[in-house]
């Protein structure tokens, strides 16, 4: 029941900032506060290409010994973390209600290659228990990327993926990113259920990752209650993105974008 309520019920901190305010949960409030989400018309992503983990230099013993100690106590850090998590969850839920589960509408066409920005270097264990790193293992050819942190967001991503049947040559990759260690380990425990939900041929394309960030505004994933999808080019730049459940117009724009991106890459 909670799932159905959430589905019928998002503001992109990506484009518009608003003052946080708790809202009434009445039906009247829902109808009165519905707004049309903006379109993602400018490139999103990181300005600098991430360094692959194998190239990151580990700190030396001297650097570890001379690193300044934290001035806050473990209890204080824990309290700050819990407060941040609480604010993030409440704000995310209010955003889902405000825009009916849609952070933004997809761009009508691909972002130009020269202005496109970089995707995060997500990494984790695949369903085949193999370690995967986005830039190390998936760079080199275009792919469709689904990003989510819960079943609701994953189902939204699947609503996009079901329209990709004519493009079976385009790899589909999944990242289930958790910012909570308990949820991360629960995902690992119930991994069998996840395996049953996707074809076996995709098991090595699905990773479960841990990252303690509560949002990724640089790539337009400001609300982890919903799922985001991306078209990633051969250099791991974000050329197109979507969120929530797709509209018919967005699906047609996605199909056109895939044809253009793949044909250019082949050519």
UniProtKB/Swiss-Prot annotation:
One Gene Ontology cellular component: mitochondrion
Places the protein is found: Mitochondrion inner membrane
Pfam entry (one): ATP-synt_10
Annotated InterPro entries: ATP10
Keyword terms of this UniProt record: Membrane, Mitochondrion, Mitochondrion inner membrane
GO molecular function (one): unfolded protein binding
One GO process term, biological-process aspect: mitochondrial proton-transporting ATP synthase complex assembly
Role summary: Involved in assembly of the mitochondrial F1-F0 complex.
Family affiliation: Belongs to the ATP10 family.
Protein name: Probable mitochondrial ATPase complex subunit atp10
Organism: Schizosaccharomyces pombe (strain 972 / ATCC 24843)
């Amino acid at each position: 029941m909670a799932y159905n309520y959430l589905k019928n019920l998002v503001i992109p901190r990506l484009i518009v900032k608003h003052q946080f305010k708790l809202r009434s949960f009445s039906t009247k409030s829902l109808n009165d506060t519905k707004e049309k989400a903006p379109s993602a018309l400018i490139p999103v992503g990181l300005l600098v290409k991430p360094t692959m983990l194998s190239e990151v230099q580990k700190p030396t013993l001297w650097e570890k010994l001379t690193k300044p100690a934290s001035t806050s106590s473990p209890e204080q850090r824990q309290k700050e973390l819990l407060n941040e998590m609480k604010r993030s969850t409440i704000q995310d839920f209010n955003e889902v209600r405000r825009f009916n589960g849609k952070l933004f509408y997809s761009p009508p066409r691909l972002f130009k290659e020269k202005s496109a920005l970089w995707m995060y270097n997500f990494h984790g264990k695949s369903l085949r228990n193999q370690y995967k790193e986005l830039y190390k293992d998936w760079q080199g050819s275009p792919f469709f990327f689904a990003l989510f942190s819960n079943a609701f967001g994953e189902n939204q991503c699947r609503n996009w993926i079901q329209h990709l049947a004519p493009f079976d040559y385009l790899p589909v990759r999944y990242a289930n990113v958790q910012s909570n260690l308990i949820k991360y380990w629960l995902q690992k425990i119930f991994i069998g259920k996840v395996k049953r939900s996707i074809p076996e041929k995709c098991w090595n394309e699905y990773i479960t990752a841990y990252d303690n960030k509560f949002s990724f505004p640089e790539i337009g994933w400001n609300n982890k209650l919903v799922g985001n999808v991306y078209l990633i080019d051969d250099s791991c730049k974000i050329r197109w993105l979507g969120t929530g459940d797709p509209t018919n117009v967005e699906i047609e724009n996605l199909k056109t974008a895939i044809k253009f991106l793949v044909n250019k890459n082949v050519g």
